[in-house]
Amino acid sequence: MSDDTPHPEWQLVPQGNFVRLSLTLPTVTTAPDSPSLVFSHQQLEQSLGNYLRIMAGRWQDQTLVRLAVNNQLLDARQLQAIAAGLKEQNLTLQWVETNRRQTAVAAASAGLSVDQTMADKPLVDPSETPSLPKPLVVRHTLRSGGEIRHGGDVVIIGDVNPGSSIVADGDILIWGCLRGMAHAGAKGNDQAVIMILRLAACQIRIGDRLARVGADAVDRREPEIAYITSEGIRLTPVRQFQRSALL
């Protein structure tokens, strides 16, 4: 990038036992109604390295980093470059905050924890039902320590390992074994469900309800669905489930 080209803007703020790193990517208009400025992963890593060298000494070694990118669109190589730049300064990228589904998928696929929030939208008629964001689909196993937070439905094609967690405002579908924590309808949606290919967790959550799973349920090796009834959370084989059974 030449000297007169806009550069990525970084801001690092220590917050307790981690640091928050915000990234803003400027845009330029290359054609009518077509704002764009793409930074390669090498450019992002170099820019971050320069910034961190200026900020050196403001954190302890191995401090965890929460990267806030908001509406910026980043792919896996760019996220890996940011992680590499942080590692050179003894910082560890752990979380990514974004309201772009593509960035959330790239981060989750890289094994990072994800907090996907909805982008700010113009005010609408309060009588209109707010729509959930598109489902977040993660095509790999969620390893221990990984976190997924999403304002809509979450689909995991893989296992959810012990020590990992999924929190969704909508439904959760796990095409694998659930050994970690799953919380559907996190903002009080009692109509949310959790569908699991195989359950090996001790507890699950829907809305504000908590269910402890007995050993007999854990041993069942068939797809199951968890949902709320008038008696609390119920776990039923998918082949026996009827939508009318929901609270």
Swiss-Prot record:
It comes from the Bacteria. InterPro entries: CAP/MinC_C, MinC, MinC_C_sf, Septum_form_inhib_MinC_C. It holds the Pfam family MinC_C. The keyword Ligase does not apply. The keyword Cell division applies. Keywords: Cell cycle, Cell division, Septation. GO terms for biological process: cell morphogenesis; cytokinesis, division site positioning; division septum assembly; regulation of cell septum assembly. Belongs to the MinC family. NCBIfam families: minC (TIGR01222), PRK00513.2-4 (NF001778). Cell division inhibitor that blocks the formation of polar Z ring septums. Rapidly oscillates between the poles of the cell to destabilize FtsZ filaments that have formed before they mature into polar Z rings. Prevents FtsZ polymerization. Interacts with MinD and FtsZ. This is Probable septum site-determining protein MinC. It comes from Synechocystis sp. (strain ATCC 27184 / PCC 6803 / Kazusa). The lineage of its organism: Bacteria, Bacillati, Cyanobacteriota, Cyanophyceae, Synechococcales.
